[in-house]
Amino acid sequence: MASEENVPFDPTSFEHIPVLLNECLEGLAIDPAGTYLDGTAGGAGHSRQIALRLDAAKGGRLISLDQDPDAVQTARARLAGLPATVVQINFRYAGQALEELGIDKINGALLDLGVSSHQLDDAARGFSYRADAPLDMRMSQQGETAADLVNTLSREDLARILRDYGEEPFAWQIAGKIEEARENAPIETTLQLADIVASAMPPAERRKNKNPSRRTFQALRIAVNHELDALEEGLDTIFEHLAPGGRLCVITFHWLEDRLVKNKFRRWATACTCPPEFPVCVCGGKAKAKLITRKPIEANTQELEENRRSRSAHLRVLEKC
């Protein structure tokens, strides 16, 4: 019998319900003759609906990116026959991908920053604290794993990651328990880590919190994949390649992402760059963009009922001047 590692990936198994789909399509204001970028293909839910609205005869084209090889296989299968090109690369390098394809400007771009249902539900990927699996958490399946971090970082560095990326109030205690546990044996699986996290919590907190490991797993995932650095760089390079009048839609799922996107959008949409203590503007600056959404768009009642993972989704839309 073939080992589980040798079983070829089946693209039809990659399930991902696109969040805020109609709102994204409206936000992009798709021109059938335009060139669009989906920086996070995932299960190609958003990508397919964008591509279906493009007219190849008029030059319409979609570039769909993902760093996850499973997502790339899925996107290629589901976008077959449509005016779409799929590239395996992190969206932080979107500019490089576009330039290699001979594309200077795009008419719109979408980033869906959520972990896909497939990644969460596939225990072997190590994202979930609900099933035992190797402690991995890598989107690209390359580089350091979560196990590498928990077994090598100092207590101080682990606590900082848990505090900064997970808002974990018991970060220091959890980091201490991790340090103690790895002295006896390496921490290699998700349930090992989940048990260690639970042991660091006061009994009252364990009773109150059904998922005491959630914040720790989020923090480690962000650290393993350098998610905030990738987002910062990706937003900059995508905005640089956006044509005047082009739209940028970003879906976030936690406050760290949303704050970064909100602040970036506000800076681009602000004309004056003078220091705040200046009584009047002397820079003569012009806004680089305008906000299409002053406040983030959230899932409606129907979508919340159909897809519980949409409950924390926030969509922000920007148009380049």
Residue ranges and their predicted role:
Residues 1-321:
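S-adenosyl-L-methionine-dependent methyltransferase catalytic core, i.e., the SAM/SAH-binding region
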